[in-house]
């Protein structure tokens, strides 16, 4: 329940979503609770109740993540598996970055995005303006954070090609 019984009638619509299975984090409280109210007064009541529920459930973060890390780092075989997975992930990210930079160079006919291949990590900012980011979303269904930050990992499996094509079209006007 997202609200106490006295506030339940103030909610026009409520929804709870769990993302635990999506991320494989079954005990980490991954999800969202939402409520829509038809007046500001009702919103205030529901918001207060949801804040209380939030405080009761999330005052202290789960500590089992640290326990899992401790077990992995203390066990020679698990530690080796973890290092191998990190190496594979790092190499995958580098490949995606290179492929994306190459495809953007090809489709946009510019070296403007070559820096992407040299970055490290899961995210990069493309240096696109607000209007370009909006055009990617509205015209091509490509969702990019407002400052043009993209998740490199989300462009695996050849998804960098249509993304680069959309960027090229947006830049071409």
Across the structure, where does each feature detected by a protein language model lie?
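Single conserved hydrophobic/aromatic residue that forms the stacking wall/gate
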Residues: 1-8, 12
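Conserved core segment of the aminotransferase class I/II
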Residues: 16-18, 22-84
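Catalytic cores of large soluble enzymes that bind and process phosphate-bearing ligands
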Residues: 57, 61, 88, 92, ...
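A structural signal for short secondary-structure junctions
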Residues: 63, 115-118, 144
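Conserved PLP-binding catalytic core of the aspartate aminotransferase-like
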Residues: 81-139
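PLP-dependent enzyme catalytic core of the Aspartate aminotransferase-like
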Residues: 102-106, 128-173
């Amino acid at each position: 329940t997202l609200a106490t019984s006295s506030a339940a009638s103030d909610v026009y619509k409520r929804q709870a979503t769990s993302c635990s299975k999506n991320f494989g984090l079954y005990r980490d409280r991954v999800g969202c609770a939402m409520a829509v109210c038809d007046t500001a007064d009702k919103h205030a009541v529901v918001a207060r109740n949801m804040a209380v529920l939030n405080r009761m459930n999330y005052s202290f973060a789960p500590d089992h993540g640290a326990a899992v890390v401790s077990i992995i780092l203390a066990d020679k075989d698990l530690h080796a598996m973890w290092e191998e997975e990190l190496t594979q992930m790092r190499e995958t990210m580098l490949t995606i970055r290179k492929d994306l930079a190459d495809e953007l160079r090809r489709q946009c006919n510019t070296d403007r995005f070559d820096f992407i291949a040299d970055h490290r990590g899961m995210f990069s900012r493309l240096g696109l303006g607000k209007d370009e980011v909006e055009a990617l979303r509205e015209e091509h269904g490509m969702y990019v954070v407002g400052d043009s930050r993209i998740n490199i990992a989300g462009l695996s499996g050849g998804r960098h090609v249509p993304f680069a094509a959309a960027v090229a079209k947006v830049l071409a006007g």
